[in-house]
């Protein structure tokens, strides 16, 4: 029996837990079953209590104290420990039916998604290649305020593409916190970010003035230098060559926005194709023999 799930990922501050809460609320409103899994060992509080919490197995605070590791090293240790104790996941997830949407709330350290092979191993165990047989989709969140700084936006886009290539699973990329940029960017301009128009970088490079000589170690000198422009151009060309990344817009305060994102997730994991037709309620049954035709 297949199961269905979504890995909610993205850099710290992108609004992952807030999106999870909005998604759970929407699912409850529409009477859909969900199972909330927290996989962030450093998490502190939630709007909805997780049904399964990695902190019951291991916490980042304990690891940093006992192993004398920093935050990043401690997080890597936590995931290594999880991979050694996968029965912690299987015992809770195996009984779930195909009616559930399993929501995995992931940590914000993007190195887990981009170049450390821990998460691909976890995905392989959870997905249809592993014993749990979960149809998985990754939802990668990027904060919409990144569009104010084009270079920062394309760096975030590059990290999203890196996660797509490394995890090798269906992906939905999301620009979160859209309510914060409505008055900053026009709709026409925002559309170029949603569809990732690499000419945005070229526009910025072409319109920039020649850098003024200054301290080569200063931030302003570095960001206006020719090397930085060449780097931006190379990043834009790489993203354009793959043509993989586009974004959905998300405002968690807007029910229709959450529903639209969920619809794309459902399509990616083929959720509705596996659902059995529901029997009508007794009060909705019609006696066609007595009905006027």
UniProtKB/Swiss-Prot annotation:
InterPro entries: Gpn, Gpn3, P-loop_NTPase. Residues 282-293 have a biased composition (Acidic residues). Keywords: GTP-binding, Hydrolase, Nucleotide-binding. Residues 272-293 are annotated as: Disordered. CDD domains: GPN3. A motif (Gly-Pro-Asn (GPN)-loop) lies at residues 70-72. Residues 272-281 have a biased composition (Basic and acidic residues). One of its GO terms (biological process) is protein import into nucleus. The record marks 72 as: Stabilizes the phosphate intermediate. GTP binds at residues 13-18, 176-179. It comes from the Eukaryota. One of its GO terms (molecular function) is GTP binding. Heterodimers with gpn1 or gpn2. Binds to RNA polymerase II (RNAPII). Belongs to the GPN-loop GTPase family. Small GTPase required for proper nuclear import of RNA polymerase II and III (RNAPII and RNAPIII). May act at an RNAP assembly step prior to nuclear import. This is GPN-loop GTPase 3. It comes from Aspergillus fumigatus (strain ATCC MYA-4609 / CBS 101355 / FGSC A1100 / Af293) (Neosartorya fumigata).
């Amino acid at each position: 029996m297949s199961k269905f799930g979504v890995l909610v990922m993205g850099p710290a501050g992108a609004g992952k837990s807030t999106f999870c809460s909005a998604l759970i609320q929407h699912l409850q409103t529409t009477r859909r079953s969900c199972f909330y899994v927290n996989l962030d060992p450093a998490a502190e509080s939630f709007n909805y209590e997780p049904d399964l919490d990695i902190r019951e197995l291991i916490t980042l605070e304990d690891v940093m104290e006992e192993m004398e590791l920093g935050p990043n090293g401690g997080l890597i240790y936590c995931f290594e420990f999880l991979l050694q104790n996968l029965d912690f996941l299987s015992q809770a997830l195996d009984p779930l039916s195909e009616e559930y949407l399993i929501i995995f709330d992931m940590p914000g350290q993007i190195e887990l998604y981009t170049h450390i092979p821990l998460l691909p191993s976890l995905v392989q165990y959870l997905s249809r290649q592993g014993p749990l047989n979960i149809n998985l989709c990754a939802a990668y969140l990027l904060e919409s305020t990144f569009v104010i700084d084009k270079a920062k936006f394309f760096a975030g886009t590059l990290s999203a593409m890196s996660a797509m290539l490394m995890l090798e699973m269906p992906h939905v990329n999301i620009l979160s916190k859209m309510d914060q940029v409505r008055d900053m960017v026009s709709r026409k301009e925002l559309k170029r970010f949603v569809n990732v128009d690499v000419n945005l970088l070229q526009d910025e490079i072409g319109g920039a003035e020649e850098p003024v000589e200054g301290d080569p170690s200063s931030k302003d000198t570095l960001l206006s230098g020719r090397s930085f422009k060449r780097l931006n151009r190379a990043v834009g060309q790489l993203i354009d060559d793959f043509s993989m990344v586009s974004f959905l817009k998300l405002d968690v305060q807007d029910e229709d926005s959450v529903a639209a994102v969920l619809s794309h997730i459902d399509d990616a994991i083929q959720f509705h194709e596996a659902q059995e037709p529901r029997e009508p309620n007794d009060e909705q049954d019609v006696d066609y023999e007595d009905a006027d035709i």
